[in-house]
């Protein structure tokens, strides 16, 4: 991102402090880069629009990727808790580049038509079992990275989603045990090429969902103990400042526990795996007439307690 773009983004984030949704100040794990550091590092975001505590400086034995951090479980989380409680130097936000909180996971699991009110806007029945599809991990980008419109599609749409990040390996997980396998939650933008999703490729959704840059995540992995109730969070999307989606995760048909139990019948979950849990109503394709993203648009996806991600469309 150009310096001018980064300054503009910082201004937007500082203005976000006036928005109705305020992220939690509890444990907010991030992956970031800084000019004086070699490669990605792990950190703690200090608050909405705030700076970053360098966890790798606090404890050089910590891994530098979120997946490795999660694989070590309580041992690394306890270090992060100590860092959160200590009075540590904070890197100014203007000096760091936020990466997706998880990069290159083993899998990105997605759920279709998982909001009651989203089903209503399509005039379709509520599913009786989860509708599962996927994105390739190569679609993941950071919370403030650009979304690139592919030349193959003329119908690129927005979708704000609550994303679950897995923290513990498991298969055939019972719903009652599912939250023990969750590390935390983050904001996702499930960018979707509707022509490829709905008409091309035999109407299989994969290609329409998995173009490069079609899965912005962030800004932080908010640990599950920092989120009061993941199934009662305000969720919204803005395009160029206009609210296009506004809902609540209490409208989800299948909750986090149900999704983990269902999907783990088929595949093994690993630390760092991501589950996109579906989108509320208000997507562009079901508007009359339909509305799609164009170059120059700015999309803001926001979830109460988790934060906001901002992506310029290019």
Swiss-Prot record:
SUPFAM superfamilies per UniProt: FAH
Cofactor list: Mg(2+); Mn(2+)
Function: Tautomerase that converts enol-oxaloacetate, a strong inhibitor of succinate dehydrogenase, to the physiological keto form of oxaloacetate. It is thereby required to maximize aerobic respiration efficiency by preventing succinate dehydrogenase inhibition.
Major subcellular location class: mitochondrion
Transit peptide stretch: 1-84
Top enzyme class: isomerase
Gene, per the UniProt record: FAHD2A
Cross-referenced PANTHER family: FUMARYLACETOACETATE HYDROLASE DOMAIN-CONTAINING PROTEIN 2A-RELATED (PTHR42796:SF3)
Name by which UniProt lists this protein: Oxaloacetate tautomerase FAHD2A, mitochondrial
Subcellular localization(s) per the UniProt record: Mitochondrion
UniProt organism field: Homo sapiens
Binding site residues for Mg(2+): 159, 161, 190
């Amino acid at each position: 991102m150009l310096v001018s773009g980064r300054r503009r983004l910082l201004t937007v984030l500082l203005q976000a402090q006036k928005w109705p949704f305020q992220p939690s100040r509890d444990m907010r794990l991030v992956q970031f880069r800084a000019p004086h550091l070699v490669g990605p590092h792990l950190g703690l975001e200090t608050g909405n629009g705030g700076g970053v505590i360098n966890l790798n400086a606090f404890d050089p034995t910590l891994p530098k990727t979120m997946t490795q951090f999660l694989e070590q479980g309580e041992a690394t989380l306890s270090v992060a808790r100590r860092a959160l409680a200590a009075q540590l130097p904070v890197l100014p936000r203007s000096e760091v580049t936020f990466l997706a909180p998880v990069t290159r996971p083993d899998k990105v699991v997605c759920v279709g038509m998982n909001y009651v009110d989203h089903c209503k806007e399509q005039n379709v029945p509520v599913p009786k079992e989860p509708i599962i599809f996927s994105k390739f991990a190569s679609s993941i980008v950071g919370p403030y990275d650009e979304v690139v419109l592919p030349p193959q599609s003329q119908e690129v749409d927005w979708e704000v989603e609550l994303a679950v990040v897995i923290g513990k390996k498991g298969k055939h997980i019972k719903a009652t045990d599912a939250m023990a396998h969750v590390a935390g939650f983050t904001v996702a933008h499930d960018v979707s090429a509707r022509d490829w999703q709905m008409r091309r490729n035999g109407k299989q959704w994969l290609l329409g969902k998995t173009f490069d840059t079609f899965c912005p995540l962030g800004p932080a992995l908010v640990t599950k103990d920092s989120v009061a109730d993941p199934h009662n969070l305000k969720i919204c999307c803005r395009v160029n400042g206009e609210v296009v989606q506004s809902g609540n995760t209490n409208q989800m048909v299948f909750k986090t526990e149900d999704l983990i139990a269902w999907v783990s019948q088929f595949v093994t979950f690993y630390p760092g795996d991501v589950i996109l849990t579906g989108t509320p109503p208000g997507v562009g394709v079901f508007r009359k007439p339909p509305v799609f993203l164009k170059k120059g648009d700015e999309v803001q996806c926001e979830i109460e307690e988790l934060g906001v991600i901002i992506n310029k469309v290019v």
